[in-house]
UniProtKB/Swiss-Prot annotation:
Stored PROSITE patterns: DNA_MISMATCH_REPAIR_2
Protein name per its UniProtKB record: DNA mismatch repair protein MutS
Species of provenance: Latilactobacillus sakei subsp. sakei (strain 23K) (Lactobacillus sakei subsp. sakei)
CDD domains given in the database record: ABC_MutS1
GO cellular component: cytosol
Similarity comment: family membership: Belongs to the DNA mismatch repair MutS family.
Record Pfam families: MutS_I, MutS_II, MutS_III, MutS_IV, MutS_V
Name of the gene this protein is made from: mutS
Length: 867
């Protein structure tokens, strides 16, 4: 019977470390591999597709294990972290050759979803935010940082909804909380698939003091400390690149909740989840990674301050007016690497020689950028921007003098320091060079002396330098000339006392040279680290210029205009407006522009028309135009006069919230309620067919009540599309409501959508025409025509006037809709046809997707064709 394995010192050491990191995969360094054991090994082997083996396979309790080569470990770590796991990296802290007893090992870094430093391919323009939350009553302290750039923001928030909206907007993958945060709040984070990590209060550090020096609110101070302590605990190194925290209020920016950002497809397509087809995709003509990240931040947080908006507009206008200078700027920007993340790597201690060369190359472009701005600064639009463009010449000169332009990736293998930078290093290199010349001379000398022309001198790490002679030439070798060292299949290797003596000198010079190079490199790195703040300020300045030139490029390409924004007026006058993304996809020649005009007397447009005619596009067009305008960009229109909006609310589309278990209708009502309760007269509301997620009568009653409430109480500018045509009668009683519709005509039996917004309500829905195009049986269509004629002959009941008092019923429109389904005198048909006709009458064609409509038509055809 197999015996149980006695725990070895190594496994005891492993378990001791693992106990400190129970929620992480432990990558335990053994020689050239990172090994995983026990449950970690079983799970990792599945996630990483590794071969699962075992230590002591024949024992009663074999230990599951798997491993990865140390040089390939980063890829495996990335896979685990991308899936929401943590990885603790445990390194050997001493050379196994010189260690006495067990090799000392300790965790040097805990990699988590929120602390990833290495940018992945294609992710250069994305931030990776780690967030932190503390709670006190109904108040929350909230902070976030991107460890790769050092950016730090903090706020005090009084609503869980606002807190969640901030976290979802940041696309955070990890939040740090303490044990005082209520369980229902933690559960809300988990429900959004955010990893929750715990960090209770730790000691004040220099980093905590530096980061929080401009902050005074108690909750803000507490959450900064919690976040910085967590970073120090997980990263186990100096965090000198963390920037001073900037306090902000969500109310400082145009409020866009997560639902609005999704519905408007600002940064992610509803269909694919990718950037393509979004407003970010359209606007992104940035040349730098940091510019791309800043563009996304501006898009997520449009401005409210009119002066800031105008300042951006003025800079965009200057770039538009100076094409050649803008081209020169773009050329310089293409040679600027990611200054923010380079500075982060310098401070983090992970920078290498190539990174420093990229930093030098970037700094070389700054004088060129300054020259461009100085040349187009007639209106002083770039005065502030110029103050941020410090070329940091001392750092550039240091790198130019010290670092080899062709540096290797490794910082410990030599070849990183320039010749002439350090006298001692040059001496070592000369010794190495002379030694190698001596080896070449020895090889030539021995070939001539022995007559063996393929004799060669080689080197490996086991035997050092050797003389190699092929087996075929061994007979030509003078007896006793060399000392045999190694026998190979086809050759013999030899040494001589003279060769070993020279080897010692060469290797000693190489070893000392490599060690000195690393020491010199760290000195350079530390000198650069002292200028981190200057580099970060420069990076922000360059990023902002990159975004503004991107606005200019897009505005020129698509013939955008500078909008006029006002805070003393609520009027909207958008002439020949276009949906920017649809226009890019279709091409300007094919896109049909539409005006949006809402003067002092109009707060609400009630939009009617068939599905797929362009109602949703029209609504999104206005919202995207507002967002672009308040970002400081020009807008797609012939002219644009807009108010500065404080919030945009949308309910467009109907996707079930499967994660939280809420139905389409529940989500619809919650979003509508959020808009109604939070909107002000300075807000913009877009409601697309509210009420379609429930029974017809309930839906229309709710739609009418919502329209009346917004009209009477909220007074926000509102675009409300509906398939309840009866609601158009509300324009007779609601003074600030105006009807518009999407035009459609029949030409040669074909239904043609004009995609043009026209005044007044739609006069028909074209439902039977669509059914005909879908191939419905002729007898069924004739029956539908009969029913439609009878319904159209029925007198219309007027919509009851809306009142402010909520207890007053507003039933007329609902009664009218109910009357559509009262029994009619029908032409004689068989029961089967009558059943299908009844189903058609009750089918909500206007809210069905094309696929749903086709599937239903197919079912009806099957029923009618049965014999």
């Amino acid at each position: 019977m197999p015996q149980k394995t006695k725990e070895t010192p190594m496994m005891a050491q492993y378990q001791k470390v693992k106990d400190q990191y129970p929620d992480a995969f432990l990558f335990y360094r053994l020689g050239d591999f990172y090994e995983l054991f026990n449950d970690d090994a079983v799970k990792a082997s599945q996630l990483l597709e590794l071969t699962l083996t075992a230590r002591n396979k024949n024992a009663a309790d074999p230990i599951p294990m798997c491993g990865v080569p140390h040089h390939a470990a980063q890829n495996y770590i990335d896979i685990l972290v991308d899936q929401g796991y943590k990885v603790a990296i445990c390194e050997q802290m001493e050379d196994p050759k010189t260690a006495k007893g067990m090799v000392k090992r300790e965790v040097v870094q805990l990699v988590t979803p929120g602390t990833v430093m290495d940018e992945k391919a294609g992710h250069a323009k994305q931030n990776n935010y780690l967030t932190a939350v503390v709670a006190q009553g109904d108040q929350f302290g909230f902070a976030y940082t991107d460890l790769s750039t050092g950016e730090m923001k903090v706020s005090q928030i009084s609503s869980l909804d606002v807190l969640l909206n901030e976290m979802l907007s940041l696309q955070t993958k990890e939040v740090v909380v303490n044990h005082d945060v209520p369980s229902e709040v933690v559960q809300a984070f988990v429900q959004q698939q955010i990893l929750v990590s715990y960090q209770d209060e730790g000691a004040d550090t220099a980093e905590v003091s530096f980061v929080s020096q401009n902050i005074s609110q108690p909750l803000a101070l507490a959450v900064i400390k919690q976040l910085v302590v967590y970073l120090a605990t997980t990263q186990k190194r100096h965090l000198g690149h963390l920037q001073r925290a900037q306090a902000y209020e969500p109310s400082q920016y145009l409020k866009l909740d997560h639902s609005a950002k999704m519905n408007l497809e600002l940064t992610a397509s509803l269909r694919t989840g990718h950037k393509s087809g979004t407003l970010l995709w359209l606007l992104d003509e940035t040349k730098t990674a940091m510019g791309g990240r800043l563009l996304k931040q501006w898009l997520e947080r449009p401005l409210l301050d009119l002066n800031q908006i105008k300042n951006r507009q003025n800079q965009v206008a200057s770039f538009l007016q100076h094409y050649f200078e803008r081209t020169n700027l773009q050329e310089a920007l293409t040679k600027v690497y990611d200054l923010e993340r380079l500075a982060g790597r310098v401070a983090f201690g992970s920078v290498n020689g190539r990174d420093l060369i990229q930093l030098k190359t970037s700094l070389e472009q700054i004088p060129k950028i300054k020259d461009v701005l100085t040349g187009i600064n007639e209106t002083q639009a770039f005065d502030q921007a110029l103050t941020r463009l410090d070329p940091v010449d001392d750092v550039r000169t240091l790198i130019e003098t010290a670092i080899n332009p062709d540096s290797p990736i490794s910082v410990t293998d030599g070849g990183i320091i320039q010749d002439g930078y350090d006298e001692q290093l040059d001496q070592y290199r000369n010794a190495m060079s002379n030694g190698k010349q001596w080896l070449a001379q020895l090889e030539a000398q021995e070939r001539e002396a022995t007559g063996i022309h393929n004799l060669k001198i080689g080197f490996n790490r086991v035997f050092g330098y050797y003389i190699e002679v092929t087996r075929a030439n061994l007979s030509s070798l003078p007896e006793g000339r060399y000392e045999r060292k190694q026998t190979l299949t086809n050759a013999e290797r030899f040494i001589t006392p003279e060769l070993k003596e020279k080897e010692q000198l060469i290797l000693e010079a190489e070893e000392r040279s490599t060690a000195l190079e690393y020491e010199l490199f760290t000195q350079v790195r530390e000198q650069v680290k002292l200028q981190i703040e200057r580099l970060q300020t420069l990076a922000k300045g360059v990023a902002a210029l990159d975004v503004l030139q991107s606005f200019a490029v897009v505005s020129e390409s698509y013939h955008y205009v500078q909008p006029t924004l006002r805070t003393d007026s609520r009027e909207i006058d958008l002439v020949d407006g276009r949906h920017p993304v649809v226009e890019k996809v279709l091409g300007r020649q094919k896109y049909i522009p539409n005006a949006v005009q809402m003067g002092k007397e109009t707060d609400m447009l009630l939009i009617t028309g068939p599905n797929m005619s362009g109602k949703s596009t029209y609504m999104r067009q206005l919202a995207l135009t507002v967002i672009m305008a308040q970002m400081g960009c020009f807008v797609p229109a012939k002219s644009a006069n807009l108010p500065v909006f404080d919030q945009i609310f949308t309910r467009i589309g109907a996707a079930d919230d499967l994660i939280s278990g809420q139905s389409t209708f529940m989500v619809e009502m919650m979003e509508a309620n959020r808009a109604i309760m939070s909107a002000t007269a300075n807000s913009l509301i877009l409601f697309d067919e509210i009420g379609r997620g429930t029974a017809t009568y309930d839906g229309m009653a709710l739609a009418q009540a919502i329209i009346e409430y917004i009209h009477d109480h909220v007074h926000a500018k509102t675009l409300f599309s509906t398939h309840y045509h009866e609601l158009t009668a509300l324009a007779d009683t609601l003074t600030a409501l105006r009807n518009v519709h999407v035009g459609a005509v029949e030409e040669n039996g074909e239904l043609v959508f004009l995609h043009k917004m026209l005044a007044g309500p739609a006069d028909k829905s074209y439902g039977i025409h669509v059914a005909k195009l879908a191939g419905m049986p002729e007898t069924l269509l004739q029956r539908a025509d009969v029913i439609l004629g009878q319904l159209e002959d029925k007198p219309k009941a007027p919509v009851q006037p809306a009142t402010v008092a909520p207890a007053q019923p507003a039933a007329a429109a609902v009664e009218e809709q109910m009357a559509l389904f009262e029994p009619e005198v029908a032409a004689p048909v068989d029961k089967k046809t009558d059943k299908v006709v009844a189903a058609i009458k009750n089918f909500d064609l206007m809210s069905a997707t094309p696929l749903e409509a086709l599937n239903q038509l197919y079912e009806w055809q099957k029923q009618l064709n049965k014999h």
